[in-house]
Amino acid sequence: MFFNRVIIAGRVIAKETRQTSNNNLVVNLRLGVKEEKNVPLTHVDVVLWGKLAEQGDKKIEKDSVLVVEGVLRQDRWVNKEGEKRTKLYIKANKFCVLDMNRGGQGEETVESEEEKKEE
């Protein structure tokens, strides 16, 4: 059996909200993450779907500090030039917006319906 669970914390550097053709809400985030002070910023893409996306659209703003829990996913496609492309991202199951003015305490943890069923 294999294990696929990711927990990451970072600052939101980009946020895009859209609806799919069948009216599902999707929130795409890019988090800026640093391991240490003098290490370059790593950009990590995070995707929120459905009810989690609805909550994320309301609660998450650019420059918010988040803790995200989810699974690592990979998109694969062929571009116009015929080259195979891949992209890794985190499909979020939970997130918590941290209030840095209160010492990094979280407001509340928001989780997907699938995550609630597993508990």
Where are these regions (language model features)?
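Short, conserved secondary-structure segments in the cores of folded domains
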Residues: 2-3, 55-56, 62
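OB-fold and OB-like beta-barrel modules that bind single-stranded nucleic acids
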Residues: 6-14, 31, 62-74, 92-95
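A beta-strand/beta-hairpin structural motif
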Residues: 35-59
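Short coil/loop residues immediately preceding or within conserved phosphate-binding loops
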Residues: 3, 7, 26-28, 41-43, ...
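Hydrophobic alpha-helical segments of small multi-pass membrane proteins
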Residues: 44, 48-50, 87-94
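Short, Lys/Arg- and Gly-enriched loop/turn segments at beta-strand edges
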Residues: 75-80
